[in-house]
Swiss-Prot record:
Keywords: Cytoplasm, DNA-binding, Repressor, Transcription, Transcription regulation. Residues 3-58 form the HTH deoR-type domain. Residues 20-39 bind DNA. GO terms for molecular function: DNA binding; DNA-binding transcription factor activity. The keyword Transferase does not apply. This is HTH-type transcriptional regulator UlaR. It is found in: Cytoplasm. Represses ulaG and the ulaABCDEF operon. The keyword Transcription applies. The gene is ulaR. It holds the Pfam family HTH_DeoR. GO terms for biological process: negative regulation of DNA-templated transcription. GO terms for cellular component: cytoplasm.
């Protein structure tokens, strides 16, 4: 296979998935990790994709602005619905929850809406939904608006550390035995500031993300209290996480 052919296939993968890891490229093209990284570097230099740590993103990729009208278009939607329902059942009346951005986060917000629970979020589509539905207690974290993800980010992360919650629900592009990975560094760093002030960290990722490593390490596995994922998740990775004290629920 020529370099041009590899590049074409890699771009087709990105057009379909939006994001690929080096491991996925190696598996799909039957090449070495070094060759995969060279291909990604060349395509990044030519402006055809965006290189991220351990992978690449489609250059035209825009994070969807999730609403009740388009959530059904989310990848692995049915599995994410089950994950959100299971997560909502963890929270008791009167408790507070921190919910971050993404389709699973929006689904969880829908499940929590109307219940006697305080919801803390920096995800504006979810905040707008909760306000429209007249949810009793919504706290919107302050900061600078980030258009690409429809969230607010505190430049120094100082404000985020003031928002303590009983639960923090978050998701990502990858979860391995080492921990949870996020591809957006600014978002990850802002959320990291809150890890020390929340009661429990619960990771919500569909089964396709288990065993994938992409971006920066957001939290070590031993910092994660619970993982809720799909039934098709990589069993080896789940066993490794359980050995480190992570409680796992497959739905």
């Amino acid at each position: 296979m020529t370099e041009a052919q590899r590049h074409q296939i890699l771009l087709e993968m990105l057009a379909q998935l939006g994001f690929v890891t080096v491991e996925k490229v190696v598996e799909r093209l039957g090449i070495s990790p070094a060759t995969a990284r060279r291909d990604i570097n060349k395509l990044d230099e030519s402006g055809k994709l965006k290189k991220v740590r351990n992978g690449a993103e489609a250059i035209t990729q825009q994070r969807p602005r999730w609403t009740p009208m388009n959530l059904h278009q989310a990848q692995n939607h049915d599995e994410k619905v089950r994950i959100a329902k299971a997560a909502s059942q963890l929270v008791n009346p009167g408790e507070s929850v921190v919910i971050n951005c993404g389709s699973t986060a929006f689904l969880l917000g829908q499940e929590m809406c109307g219940k006697p629970v305080q919801i803390i979020t920096n995800y504006l589509p979810l905040a707008n939904y909760l306000i429209d539905q007249e949810h009793d207690s919504v706290i919107i974290m302050g900061g600078q608006y980030n258009k690409s993800q429809s969230i607010t980010l505190s430049p120094q992360g100082s404000e985020n550390s003031l928002y303590a919650g009983h639960w923090m629900f978050t998701s990502s592009k990858g979860l391995t035995a080492e921990g949870l990975y996020k591809t957006d560094m600014l978002t990850a760093m802002a959320e990291q500031k809150m890890l020390s002030v929340v009661g429990k960290l619960v990771v919500l990722v569909d089964s396709s993300k288990i065993g994938e490593r992409a971006g920066m390490l957001f939290s070590r596995a031993d910092q994660i209290d619970m993982l809720i994922t799909g039934k098709n998740a990589n069993p080896e990775t789940l066993q490794q996480l359980e050995a480190q004290g992570v409680s796992i629920l497959r739905v």
